[in-house]
A protein has these predicted regions:
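Non-transmembrane, aqueous-exposed alpha-helical and coiled segments at domain scale
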Residues: 1-28, 32-167
Length: 167
């Protein structure tokens, strides 16, 4: 089972996708999966593969989803510490239901930008998620789409899903 490992005051903390999902709940598994994979993609690039002190990680993102926010919070405490900044108008990146899949992490003077590659987020999902006044049947379909996206993301390596650029 893959895990994200960070430090808190020098002590190792490990979080699996399942841990993050337990913290978040069942509402947005796709968002939790995005955050999990994005952190796996970005963190090794922020300090040459060394473990990061979690409370020193800052995130600027165009992705406002609650699944992602909860996953980032559990690993980095960025919500509690005011180290996450959501700006839906950030540079071009693939659209999400209510923002964009753009993540800019900073750590001790180094910055990495992570964006999703085409093909992992289906247009029918975005359309369904944005649809106002969904029926109960559509809510069931959307919930399945979220689970399917989480599986699609987790079945791939982070490098296959996301581009990363060191600034």
């Amino acid at each position: 089972m893959e895990k994200i490992t960070v430090l808190e005051k020098g002590q190792k903390l490990e979080c699996s996708f399942e841990d993050l999902l337990k913290y978040h709940g069942v509402g947005y598994p796709g968002g939790v999966a995005h955050a999990f994979q994005v952190m796996q993609r970005a963190f090794p690039l922020l300090d040459d593969g060394k473990l990061l002190e979690r409370r020193e990680i800052e995130l600027v993102t165009a992705f406002p989803g609650p699944g992602g926010r909860d996953a980032f919070e559990m690993v980095t405490r960025c919500v509690t510490d005011g180290q996450i900044h959501v700006d839906k108008d950030l540079p071009e990146a693939a659209g999400s239901p209510h923002g964009r899949y753009y993540f800019r992490f900073s750590y001790r003077g180094k910055t990495v930008v992570v964006t999703i590659r085409p093909g992992f987020v289906r247009q029918d999902f975005i359309e369904m998620a944005r649809k106002p006044n969904r029926t109960e049947e559509e809510e069931v379909i959307l919930a399945q789409m979220k689970r399917d996206m989480a599986k699609r993301l987790l079945d791939a390596k982070p490098e296959e899903v996301y581009d990363a650029m060191i600034l």
